[in-house]
Regions:
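Polar-ligand-bearing catalytic/cofactor-coordination segments
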Residues: 2-399, 413-498
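Short, contiguous hydrophobic alpha-helices characteristic of membrane insertion segments
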Residues: 401-412
Length: 498
């Protein structure tokens, strides 16, 4: 098997470009399937009942109709207006995704094909690619840096040092398209639909912080990762998995305390007199289900967006802390917030966090195990014009591991797309279970959760009209009609409408 895969006659470059194009075409096909659903002017019969507020508080979205922008009129939107708002928002997002996907695909082809290499003076008669040219530039920069850098900042000129320069160059080329795309999405698309709360100064500040954090944390981790793989050889999977698990556990604990405060302000819920009923209800709920509640935090999500959210964090077996977005508190009643938290804590009670972590680790382990067939495959590197590092090993000629992982990942892009269906299916199943957990608590939990979902969906202009295949690929959460139907609300709603 290995001997067959290492034949230089295998056109790996053409295969990967074809696979990349196939995945792109499939994703665009899904977008095209979704478009007719977003152009409906009247809610489909299966959705219409959920937009009629027969027995609960109506989601008050004080906005003009979809063709008049998002300024406050002082009047609550009708269910029809709410539906049209969500349709307009979803349609704009899909159109944006189609354009952004096309640009990303051009960037991918430029890196993987010989096209960009001609600008670096590559020999047109030999295999070449954009990544091979970037690697050659990274070698040059690492040697230049070794000559001019202060002693404390010298990192050598070996594979790891060159790989760090390569990753930096790759990130910089990505910024050419990602920065304009992010600016458009934030200040045009989100602004148009009333969600953006950021100023340009805040966006720039966030971008600088994110870039610096990525460099300060990401580059050392990449160095450790590459060293581990090179040190462990063919047995690298188990050691890399231990490294990744350590990173995941650190993020569980460190992100809320070390990273998130750089972007958002956390305040104790007790500091808000108007939300003391939420505090009382949450503490009672936690006590009822034996949730190890630590602190209740409020995060200033409204600083950047009108979207709402709630989550908890903490290592398995230890105290957990709950975080509520201020937008959720402003948009929902105390009973609805409690119902939302009952759903979130249901994930903890049903061990969903551990299940998702375990499934992701299994998926990563299987992927890395498959990568072993290609990390030292000279034919793969040759096809893209990537030279050997020189020297040898028991596995053969040494090639840049960072490029090996990049190319192996490109080979398995279709598989990753298929796994999106399975991972989303698992996630949606767990969401249904968490909804049912909240409903099974009795009392008004089912009704309050229903109206919380309706209100949050309306406030966030969530898509309620979806193509089934598009939804299966893109949505980790069930749609609003699906969740309400599973909660057993549909029959009750129909009775009240008669």
């Amino acid at each position: 098997m290995l001997e067959f895969l290492q034949q230089t006659t295998i056109p790996y470059q053409a295969i990967i470009l074809a696979l990349s194009g196939g995945v792109y075409a499939f994703e665009q096909y899904l977008n095209v399937r979704q478009l007719p659903h977003l152009k409906l002017k009247v809610p489909p019969p299966s959705i219409a009942p959920y937009l009629v507020t027969a027995d609960g508080p109506k989601p008050e979205i004080k906005e003009k109709p979809a063709d008049q922008g998002d300024e406050d009129t002082g009047e609550p939107a009708s269910p029809q207006e709410t539906f049209m708002k969500s349709q307009a928002y979803a349609l704009d997002k899909v159109k944006f995704a189609m354009i952004a996907g096309f640009i990303d695909q051009i960037e991918t082809w430029a890196l993987l094909s010989p096209f960009a290499a001609v600008f670096f003076g590559s020999d047109p008669t030999k295999p070449a690619s954009g990544i091979a040219s970037l690697w050659a530039l990274a070698i040059h920069l690492s040697h230049r840096w070794a000559l001019v850098a202060p002693k404390l900042l010298k990192i050598g000129t070996g594979e790891i040092a060159t790989s760090l320069f390569f990753v930096t160059l790759l990130s910089l080329t990505g910024m050419i398209t990602s920065v304009p795309s992010s600016l458009y999405k934030t200040f045009v698309l989100e602004e148009k639909h009333g969600f953006n709360k950021q100023t340009l100064g805040l966006w720039i500040s966030d971008y600088i912080k994110t870039t610096l954090l990525s460099a300060l944390l990401g580059l050392p981790l990449i160095a450790v990762f590459l060293w581990t793989v090179r040190w462990a050889g063919e047995a690298f999977v188990q050691y890399v998995m231990m490294l990744l698990m350590g990173i995941v556990l650190f993020m569980y604990v460190g992100y809320p305390y070390l990273i998130a405060p750089l972007f958002n302000k956390f305040r104790h819920l007790s500091e808000f007199p108007e939300y003391q009923e939420v505090k009382t209800r949450t503490e009672a709920l936690a006590k009822r289900i034996n949730f190890p509640l630590g602190r209740l935090w409020v995060i200033d999500g409204s600083k950047r967006s009108a979207h709402s959210n709630a989550f908890f964090f903490g290592l398995p077996g230890f105290t957990k802390h709950i975080v509520l977005y201020d937008t959720l508190l402003k948009q929902s009643t105390p009973a609805e917030v409690e119902a939302v938290l009952a759903h979130e804590l249901g994930h903890w009670k049903l061990n969903h966090t551990v299940m998702l972590l375990g499934s992701s680790q299994v998926q990563i382990a299987l992927t890395l195990s498959t990568f072993r067939f290609f990390l030292w495959n000279g034919a793969l590197f040759y096809s893209f014009g990537v030279p050997a590092l020189g020297g040898g090993s028991e596995m053969g000629t040494r090639y840049p591991l960072i490029i090996g992982f990049l190319l192996a990942q490109s080979l398995f892009t279709p598989l990753n797309s298929l796994l999106s269906f399975t991972s989303n299916a698992l996630s949606r199943t767990l969401e249904f279970q968490a909804d049912q957990f909240a409903a099974d608590l009795g009392g008004d939990y089912a009704k309050d959760l229903k109206w919380a979902l309706v209100r949050i969906s309306a406030e966030n202009k969530a898509t309620t009209s979806c193509d089934w295949l598009y939804s299966a690929f893109h949505h980790s959460h069930p749609t609003l009609p699906e969740r309400l139907a599973r909660l057993g609300i549909e029959s009750d709603k129909n009775k009240k409408l008669k």
